[in-house]
């Protein structure tokens, strides 16, 4: 028994819980919200994946520059694209090891060590304005030949440009 200002009541006399109608209304509201939110979450995930790939590329440009200075040799990046889901890039030591040509921005043989190889997710496409889709940093951390360029990464709704400044070799990331 519980005493209230209206008198004594047994515990079983108090109404509790929700009615079936109230539960159905809440479920209907939640379903309507989910129908709106779920497609937006899918697009959000795609855009986050694109941003992650772009940021990784910026990091790999910076890594290549630092490695070139540290190793006192050319470090090159090559970009391969055009196939469905086959877009990729490679960062390698272009030191002429194994009879190759140092500084030509071509991985002449397996003796020129691969530092990083990245396969781009199939929902992200890659394109490049670099001559022959190759770029490199010399032993002083400047672009080989003093050329700059842009790598564009995009999906169906968004695009990012990774820009290498000519002469200085600085890297910037811009949502385009």
Provide a role label for each language-model segment.
Residues 1-18:
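N-terminal leader/signal peptides at the extreme start of proteins
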Residues 2, 142, 156-176:
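Low-complexity, S/T/G/P-rich flexible repeat/linker segments used as non-globular hinges
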Residues 16, 22-25, 46:
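Internal alpha-helical transmembrane segments of multi-pass membrane proteins, especially GPCRs
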Residues 24-40:
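Alpha-helical hydrophobic helix detector
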Residues 43-76:
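Membrane-proximal N-terminal amphipathic helix
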Residues 74-136, 161-162, 172-176:
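Type IV pilin-like appendage domain
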Residues 146-149:
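Short, solvent-exposed loop/turn segments enriched in Ser/Thr/Gly
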Residues 151-154:
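Short beta-strand segments that buttress and anchor functional surface loops
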């Amino acid at each position: 028994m519980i005493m209230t200002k209206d008198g004594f009541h047994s515990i079983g006399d108090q109404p509790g819980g929700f009615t079936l109608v109230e539960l159905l209304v809440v479920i209907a509201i939640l379903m309507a919200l989910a129908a709106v939110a779920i497609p937006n979450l899918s697009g959000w995930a795609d855009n986050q994946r694109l941003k992650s790939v772009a940021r990784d590329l910026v990091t790999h440009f910076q890594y290549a520059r630092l490695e070139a200075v540290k190793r006192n040799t050319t470090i090159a990046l090559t970009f391969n694209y055009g196939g469905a889901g086959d877009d990729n890039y490679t960062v390698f030591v272009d030191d002429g090891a194994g009879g190759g040509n140092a500084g030509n921005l071509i991985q002449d043989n397996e003796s020129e060590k691969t530092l990083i190889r990245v396969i781009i997710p199939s929902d992200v496409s890659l394109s490049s304005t670099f001559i022959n889709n190759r770029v490199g940093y010399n032993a002083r951390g400047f672009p080989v030949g003093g050329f700059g360029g842009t790598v564009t990464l995009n999906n169906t709704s968004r695009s990012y440009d990774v820009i290498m400044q000519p002469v200085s070799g600085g890297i910037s990331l811009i949502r385009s």
